[in-house]
Curated annotation (Swiss-Prot):
This is NAD-capped RNA hydrolase NudC. It comes from Pasteurella multocida (strain Pm70). Its EC number is 3.6.1.-, 3.6.1.22. Homodimer. InterPro entries: NAD-cap_RNA_hydrolase_NudC, NudC-like_C, NUDIX_hydrolase-like_dom_sf, NUDIX_hydrolase_CS, NUDIX_hydrolase_dom, RNA_Hydrolase_NudC, Znr_NADH_PPase. A divalent metal cation 1 binds at residues 161, 181, 222.
Length: 264
């Protein structure tokens, strides 16, 4: 990152953890001097609506009002993913100021998203840490399996998800997570899509699966409730628009409807 100049212009991405500085629900746009950003460190990380998107290094004790990145989920996917990039990069820079190998300070690498140790005898280079997390929609005939997680207790019902463990494939993680959290066995696993998820540094890897056996028995530390829901019956509160979870649910409900049409 370099010192921002008063006449530098574009969109400005200021972050505090997974929150953004917004003005009337939008990123500030204009010259750096318009928002008193000159002198802070920043860099261009992409283009938004034909203008540069500047990432500003996190400002300690900033008195501006910040809003959760989740509030912008309805943005076009490419725009939301670009904001994800900024949030994840600032998290990476903030948590890797020192070399994890020798403890010396690090510098930002100019040619790529990376930091490098200042110690000439080390020069260890580190790249942004991305923690993959599988997410899966499970179908049984014309029904979908939805769970109310402990963190959403009494609220949203959604698909099952969990982090991939060391030495585990994505597919193995899906089978393990579904079995651990609900006692359900699955089959016909297939890839659906993915989504960057800067809370703070994940990537959601989406799958579809079919029921193979078992009865629901929830892992109470993680899951408050799990049920099979008929696709054409009233559904509980679902994840917000823009999430891969909702896309998985909507796609699975379509598959449920097709299954019922075939049966009749």
């Amino acid at each position: 990152m370099n010192a921002i100049q008063p006449d530098d212009a574009g969109y400005w991405l200021l972050t505090q953890d997974s929150a953004l500085y917004l003005i009337n629900g939008e990123l500030p746009q204009g010259k750096a001097a318009d928002f008193q950003l000159q002198g802070y460190n920043g860099m261009i990380i992409g283009e938004l609506n034909g203008r540069p998107l500047w990432l500003v290094e996190e400002i300690a004790d900033d008195q501006r009002t910040y809003f959760s990145l989740r509030s912008l989920l309805a943005l076009p996917e490419a725009h939301f993913n670009l904001l994800n990039r900024g949030v994840e990069l600032n998290h990476f820079f903030k948590t890797h100021r020192f070399c994890g190998k020798c403890g010396h300070p690090t510098d930002l690498v100019q040619q790529e998203w990376a930091i490098q140790c200042q110690n000439p005898s080390c020069s260890h280079r580190t790249y942004p840490v991305i923690c993959p997390c599988i997410i899966v929609a499970v179908r049984r005939g014309a029904q979908i399996l939805l769970a109310n997680h402990q963190r959403h207790k009494g609220g949203i019902y959604t698909t099952l998800a969990g982090f991939v463990e060391v030495g585990e494939t994505f597919e193995q993680a899906v089978h393990r997570e579904v079995l651990e959290e609900t006692g359900i066995q699955i089959q016909n696993l297939r890839y659906f899509g993915s989504q960057p998820w800067a809370f703070p540094n994940s990537a959601m890897i989406g799958f579809l699966a079919d029921y193979a056996g078992g009865e629901i028995c929830v892992q109470e530390m993680e899951i408050h409730d799990a049920q099979w829901f008929d696709y054409n019956a009233p559904l509980p509160e679902l994840p917000p628009k823009g999430t891969i979870a909702l896309k998985l649910i909507e796609h699975t409900l379509q598959l449920c409807a097709e299954e019922e049409r075939k049966a009749t």
